[in-house]
Swiss-Prot record:
GO terms of biological process kind: protein folding; protein-containing complex assembly; urea metabolic process
InterPro entries per record: UreE (IPR012406), UreE_C_dom (IPR007864), UreE_N (IPR004029), UreE_N_sf (IPR036118)
Keywords: Chaperone, Cytoplasm, Nickel, Nickel insertion
GO function term, MF aspect, one: unfolded protein binding
Listed name of the protein: Urease accessory protein UreE
Name of the gene encoding the protein in the UniProt record: ureE
Organism from which the protein derives: Verminephrobacter eiseniae (strain EF01-2)
Length: 168
């Protein structure tokens, strides 16, 4: 078993050719939340992944194995609920309201400009439909937000120092 104990978030600093040549490992959200797991990469190698506790892997992250080889993490498609505003009876604000209610329930949620994604839950699906949202089951990669205390694990904000807004 090949030991992996180093993570390069989103492959930052690596040449694109290195990211493209790397073997891949496909993991769903449940597995990407674990800091210790076994997996098999696209080259058929057994991997023992041992990362610092609390580490969450994201699609596009690069793992460095003990032999120096690189493994690119892929967010594998998994069952999700796709939530969107009803074009006839709703408004884009309905998604904001849905995100608020889901956040109050501490539900892992992927935020997109025109839709939300959550893991399947029939009770939440009924609640969202009652809010006049369209809820569809699908099989897609799931990349939920890291949350307020995720130490940079969330999507879109980037590492500190690479943005220009003032801090008060």
């Amino acid at each position: 078993m090949l030991t992996v104990s180093r993570l390069i978030p989103r492959g930052q600093g690596l040449a694109p050719v290195l990211r493209q040549r790397a073997s891949t490992v496909e993991l769903d959200w449940e597995l990407r939340q674990k800091s210790r797991l076994s997996a098999t990469d696209s080259a058929g190698r057994a991997l023992g992944i041992f990362l610092p506790r609390g580490t969450r892997l994201r699609g596009g992250d690069m793992l460095v194995a003990e032999d120096g080889s690189l493994v690119r993490v892929l967010a594998t498609p998994q069952p999700v609920l796709l939530i969107s505003a009803c074009p006839k009876h709703g408004s884009p604000f309905d998604l904001t309201r849905a995100a608020y209610h889901l956040g109050n329930r501490h539900v892992p949620i992927e935020l997109q400009p025109d839709h939300l994604k959550i893991e399947p839950d029939p009770v939440l699906a009924d609640m969202l439909r009652a809010l006049h949202l369209i809820v569809q089951a699908d099989n897609l990669p799931f990349e939920p937000e890291g949350g307020a205390y995720a130490a940079g694990q969330g999507g879109g904000h980037g590492p500190h120092g690479q943005h220009t807004h003032p801090h008060h």
